[in-house]
Amino acid sequence: MAYIEFRGICKSYDGVNQVLKNINLDVEKGELVTLLGPSGCGKSTLLRSLAGLEDISSGQIILDGEDITNTPVQKRGIGMVFQQYSLFQNMNVEDNIAFGLKIAKMDKNEIDKKVKAAIEMVDLTGKEKSYPSQLSGGQQQRVAIARAIVMEPKVLLLDEPLSAIDAKLRRELQEKIKRVQKELKITTIFVTHDQDEAMIMSDKIHLMNQGIIEQSGKPVQLYTHPVSKFAAEFIGHYNILTPVELTAFFPEKRYPGNYYVIRPETFMLSKEPIEDPAYLTFDAKVVDFISRGNVLRYTLQCKDVVFTSEVLFRSFALFEPGATVHVGIEEHNLLRLND
């Protein structure tokens, strides 16, 4: 039995348009699971339904073997961190973190011990007496996380907590959250629209689209084997091609179905003809390229088909716009979608 079970979850605000459409998913104890998807797909609504902040129209939510569908928010044992830090501006770091423990009338010595441990865990030692206005956005979010984990919740819910933080700090906080989650072995559900963030953070990803679960699996599974055009477009920079477009590469072959995807990094580019029989080969013209640090992304054209390829930077293997290159791909990297 899973630690968290969503069973047939439906949600409609007007009785007609469903925000959640018969959601069924499991979360194992100790996992960090991400609900990933574009704005309006239902991911935050599903998260809030687990917290008790949203009523569901039908279905059942089970936590640790107990049906909590109608359990009041305060009795669910769930901690939640939002995009907005929601800190008490008139309280310092220590008091913000201790607030819930004081409400629970915990012994002062125990409160001090737990708050100290939480501060150390989120690397805020030395900031105990600082007020929110004296902290950076990243530090304020760490206070919010510490305030949630100090209560030792059964589940930690994170609703796009890093979206308002700049890229460098976001990466640091991603690493901190993942470290804290693993140390505490706390079951965590993370909501984001950022596929890179989901790939970095997650043990498992549930990709949502218009109120349904489009695809579930480990990050590498979603990246290497998207099941639909939506999944391929949302998860990675795939080349999405029709069977007709594929025949521009390989005129002698015929491909059934509607769509195929090719990951940019699976193409081999060469100045010399590719003799390896494991590769299907064709020629293409370089349209343009951009540098992304140690990765070069080439825009290439074969007949009327434009596609992209990514290769590690090597100064001796640069291809200038206008050049003709030999392209190879192993056939198992042509992935047929279910669409």
Q: What are these language model-derived features?
A:
Residues 5, 26, 62, 326-328:
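ABC ATPase nucleotide-binding domain
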Residues 16-18:
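Short coil-to-beta microelement around the adenine-binding A-loop and adjacent beta1/P-loop entry
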Residues 32, 73-227:
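ABC ATPase nucleotide-binding domains
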Residues 36-38:
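The feature captures the beta-strand-to-loop junction immediately N-terminal to the Walker
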Residues 51:
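Helix-to-loop junction immediately C-terminal to a conserved catalytic motif
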Residues 59-67:
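Conserved ABC transporter NBD signature motif
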Residues 248-339:
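Non-catalytic connector elements of ABC transporters
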